[in-house]
């Protein structure tokens, strides 16, 4: 049972505790930590996103679980946490992207889009009558010929990474990347490293049907999700 003095701060989003904490934001972060593992890796050719969709029942169709989304031709995101919250943010990101195209006749800059999403997420930590988003996003894209990878969290914090992970397996992913990440790796090397990180995060319980991969290329400036046979080929290479 919670101490009496703490319960009021738990219930109010906009009230700081005496030690400077917003408990509801911290609880939203816990929702992300319980989510499926997603990784993002920048490489010499672009950015790779890989997600373990965690199929919890053999009766479940893996294709019905979507954790990587295309936002615009040059941007994709991976999510961890509450799927419904992620879809809401994805829809908002798509609208912001189209508004930019209509207003300025050019694709939106990846960093600008990431900041707009984080500004929106931050407002849900500052006003009553709503709760923080219980999801985190990895935003990958190409702007001005440069690969970019950003991570958001429920507080509205925005950070840029060379390689990172979100979700339940984040500690194992970060350790793998810190030990083995190389900036000059190509798509193939980055994907193999990402699968290795997921393998560590899932304690060796990789299921090829639950792996989703998206890549955004510097050369073409386009984001795409890989087909099942492409994903299977990379997983098979890793397991050999």
From Swiss-Prot:
Keywords: Cytoplasm, Proteasome
GO terms, biological process: proteasomal protein catabolic process; ubiquitin-dependent protein catabolic process
GO molecular function: threonine-type endopeptidase activity
SMART domains: Proteasome_A_N
Activity control note: The formation of the proteasomal ATPase PAN-20S proteasome complex, via the docking of the C-termini of PAN into the intersubunit pockets in the alpha-rings, triggers opening of the gate for substrate entry. Interconversion between the open-gate and close-gate conformations leads to a dynamic regulation of the 20S proteasome proteolysis activity.
Main location: cytoplasm
SUPFAM superfamilies recorded: N-terminal nucleophile aminohydrolases (Ntn hydrolases)
GO cellular component, one term: cytoplasm
Compartments, as annotated in UniProt: Cytoplasm
Family: Belongs to the peptidase T1A family.
Subunit-structure text: The 20S proteasome core is composed of 14 alpha and 14 beta subunits that assemble into four stacked heptameric rings, resulting in a barrel-shaped structure. The two inner rings, each composed of seven catalytic beta subunits, are sandwiched by two outer rings, each composed of seven alpha subunits. The catalytic chamber with the active sites is on the inside of the barrel. Has a gated structure, the ends of the cylinder being occluded by the N-termini of the alpha-subunits. Is capped at one or both ends by the proteasome regulatory ATPase, PAN.
Role according to the record: Component of the proteasome core, a large protease complex with broad specificity involved in protein degradation.
Record protein name field: Proteasome subunit alpha
Gene: psmA
